[in-house]
Amino acid sequence: ILILVGVIAWLLLRPQEQPAGLTRAADAQLGQLEGKTEEQIVEELNRIVEEGMFNISINTQPEFPDGSSPGNLCIENSPANHYLMVVEITLNDTGEKVYTSGALEPNYHIQEAKLDRALAKGTYPATATFYAYTADTQELVGTAGAEMQLIIQN
């Protein structure tokens, strides 16, 4: 868990590209302010991690009666998330995108949906990629993925 917290903190706190025209403060020092207790530092890191994290939820074995009918994707943007979510499903063997959702606000879900492309009967290993965007600026803030199998029955 400490490694995960460290990786997340590094991703959130790493130096970003500077916008044109800004210069870094020459007298700035790396790290937390001197005199902070360990408890205060951990509390701040936990707050940053909570703000930057998001939950993903999707049926990892959705079934479709046939290649052009809706299937039970069960995509959910948890009420605890702070971000808009867009979900893309791609086939692992070809990299072909077979589904893209619209933006889901927190506490919204998609119970069933058709794939963007009809697939023949069979089981298809795929990956669902969740893209998290800020609601106000629609800036991409992160991605997460889930392995899945699309099951086309007929």
Label each residue range with its predicted role.
Residues 1-10:
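Hydrophobic membrane-insertion alpha-helices, especially the h-region
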Residues 64, 77-83:
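A short beta-turn/strand-edge loop motif at beta-sheet boundaries
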Residues 120-124:
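A glycine-anchored, Pro-Gly-centered beta-turn/N-cap motif
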